[in-house]
Design a protein with these regions (language model features):
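Membrane-helix boundary elements
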Residues: 176-186
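Conformational-control "hinges and anchors"
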Residues: 203
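Extended, low-polarity transmembrane helix blocks
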Residues: 1-62, 68-166, 186-197, 208-292
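Alpha-helical phosphate/pyrophosphate-handling elements in metalloenzyme active cores
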Residues: 173
Length: 292
């Protein structure tokens, strides 16, 4: 995978995911999420529910348009990166609200509705890769993009060991042709423990592989982590009523679409840990063989 291919993949995943999120909010999906976000800033009473959806949808739709424009040097890299930071900071700051945590289980770090919010940590490292790559070392960009992958797998994976989360994923697992067999082998909690253990194990192994520069470990654990985020995309098609004619996808669909950001993070990690040296060597060979 070349640098250009990696850039195109990251751009495509960002563009598609934010376009879907923007359209769904614009069409009225998941209004409670918007109300909770704007309530944190005491702005929930200033706009109607439909106006909140329109405002948020347009704001999110602007990001993929600016990203594509910046790739063609029609918009400055600084402008699109700052806008991405602004768009993602708005939901991320709401993690300071106690409503994002399970109060009956002691609050932080037992995450509740914040599970969909922490995914926004994945976005800014992707824009730094696209537009500020020369400002960072390859090692820094690798860890910047690994960090959100590790965070979501360790954090949400860790929640799988709690009863509330085990019960929450039943609707996802039992309708999946790839995962429903777990309930034939394990209890609801046991299956959740297996899923959580898988997430935690391979997040740690990927970190170890990157730290030790062990390519076989990076490949094996990276593919395992990738499988987690690709598997969640199948829930779009296996969970009933995720798609609808009114808002494209529902709240669950929005939650799932965000996992495409982690696929992009993993693509960046793969490029710098597995492909960058090969790509550079190929370019140097081509230059040496070209007529002087």
């Amino acid at each position: 995978m070349t640098l250009n291919q990696t850039e195109n993949m990251v751009t495509a995943l960002l563009t598609f995911s934010f376009a879907v999120l923007g359209l769904t909010f614009l069409l009225g999906a998941n209004p409670n999420a918007l109300i909770a976000t704007f309530k944190f800033y005491s702005l929930d009473t200033m706009l109607s529910e439909s106006a909140l959806g329109a405002f948020s949808g347009i704001a999110l739709l602007l990001l993929p348009l600016m990203t594509i424009a910046a790739r063609f040097n029609l918009v400055s890299a600084k402008a699109v990166t700052l806008y991405a930071a602004f768009v993602t900071a708005i939901p991320l700051l709401t993690l300071l609200s106690p409503t994002r945590w399970m109060a009956d289980l002691g609050g932080f770090p037992i995450i509740g509705s914040g599970q969909g919010i922490i995914k926004y940590f994945a976005v800014l490292p992707l824009f730094l890769f696209l537009f500020y790559r020369e400002k960072f070392s390859h090692k820094q960009l690798t860890y910047l993009n690994f960090a959100p992958v590790a965070m979501v797998l360790l954090w949400i994976g860790g929640m799988k060991f709690f009863e509330f989360e085990a019960n929450a994923i039943v609707g996802l697992v039992e309708t999946s042709p790839f995962m429903s067999w777990l309930y034939a082998v394990f209890s609801v909690q046991g299956a959740s423990n297996v899923i959580g253990g898988f997430d935690v194990l391979f997040a740690l192994l990927l970190g170890a592989g990157i730290f030790t520069k062990n390519k076989p470990v990076i490949i094996a654990s990276g593919l395992a982590c990738l499988s987690v985020f690709l598997m969640t995309q199948t829930f779009l098609f296996t969970v009933p009523d995720t798609f609808n004619s009114t808002t494209i996808v529902n709240r669950l669909g929005q939650f799932i679409i965000k996992d495409l950001w982690f696929v992009a993070n993993l693509a960046v990690v793969a490029y710098f840990t597995l492909f960058e040296a090969v790509s550079r060597e190929r370019e140097e060979t081509q230059l040496s063989q070209s007529p002087q």
